[in-house]
Amino acid sequence: SFPTRRSSDLENQLNPDHERAHWVLLPGNARKQYLDLVKKQEKLEEVSSKSPYNYLEGLNPEYDYEFGVIACGIGYNYVKEADTDSCHIPVLKVSQYPLPAEEIRTMADRCGYVLVVEDGQPFVEEQVKAILSSDYEVKGRLTETLPRTGELTPDNVGEAIGWGIKRPFGKPQVVMPRPPALCQGCGHRDVYDALNKVAAEYPDARIFGDIGCYTLGALPPFRAIDSCVDMGASITMAKGASDAGVFPAIAVIGDSTFTHSGMTGLLDAVNDRANITVVISDNLTTAMTGGQDSAGTN
C-alpha cells in the first residue's frame, strides 16, 4: 500500500474552524469576510501602538530636533552602527504593520523632517507619508536621500543621516571576484555542453531556463540559456516562442522545479501539440535551496 503520513507526525494539534462561510468564498461570503478584515485592521492598529516591538528612542518632548529617524529591519541596525558619536536624535523602530501611527505623529511633531530607513522597496516611507499630512517632510528612498535602488549599508545610511562615516581601510585589491559557477562534476554541465553543440547548428535556437542552480548556465563558460523569469516559465515561454515561429524552442528545467510548477506548463504544451523540446535536468536533489525532499527526489 502507498505509505501516508499520520496526523501524529504533526507538531501541532488541529484547531478546526467548522464555519463554512469562513472558507467557502462565494461572493456573498467574500464581502462579509472583507468587512471582518477591515474591522480587524482597526484592532491591529491599536495593538501596534502598544506593541513592545515598536519603540521610540531618544525623544525628549521638550526639545525640537532637526530630524528624526524611522527605521525597520536591518536599516535599524545600520542606524545604530552609523551612530558612532552617539548623536542624540529620536529613532522610532517599527517591526510590524500597521505602523504605530500615534508614535509616528508624536515624533514628527518635534522634528524638522523624518528620515525613513528601510531596505528594499519604500513601503514604510509611503505609509508614513499617508499617516502624516503634507505639512511634514518625509525623506528616504523616494527622495533619493537614500539610494532609490540597491541595498542599504552603514556607509550610505551614515551619509544620509549626515554623520559622514569614514572607513579606516578600503576593499583589498588582492581579493579577486569569484562569480558563482556550476559545481565541478555537476551533471548540469554536461547538459549545457550538449545543448550548446546542438544549438550551434540552429542560428535561431532559443533555450529557456528556469529557477535553480542550473540557472548559472547563463554565465560563462556556457552562456547556454536565453531567459530565466520564474519557476515553471521555461516550458510556457518555450511554448509561446514556438507558437510564434521560433525553432528549435528548448526548455531546461530541474527535477524539483518541474514538480513544483512545471507540470501544468508541460500539460498545456502536450495538449496543444507544441513543437518544443523539454529537458528535465535531474541532479537527484533539491540543490539550490537546502537539499529538502520534494516530489522530484522521493
For each predicted feature, which ranges?
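Flexible, low-complexity linker and terminal segments
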Residues: 1, 5-182, 187-188, 201
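Short acidic, glycine/serine/threonine-rich loops at helix termini
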Residues: 5-12, 80-83, 103-104, 125-129, ...
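Acidic, Ser/Thr-rich peripheral helices and adjacent loops at domain boundaries
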Residues: 9-20, 226-233, 294-298
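Well-ordered alpha-helical segments embedded in enzymatic catalytic cores
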Residues: 43, 78, 99-103, 194, ...
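Short, well-ordered loop/turn and helix-capping segments at boundaries between secondary-structure elements
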Residues: 113, 130-134, 272-275, 282-285, ...
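Conserved phosphate/anionic-ligand binding catalytic regions in large, soluble enzymes, centered on
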Residues: 184-197, 231-236
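An acidic intrinsically disordered interaction segment
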Residues: 196-210
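Thiamine diphosphate
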Residues: 206-287
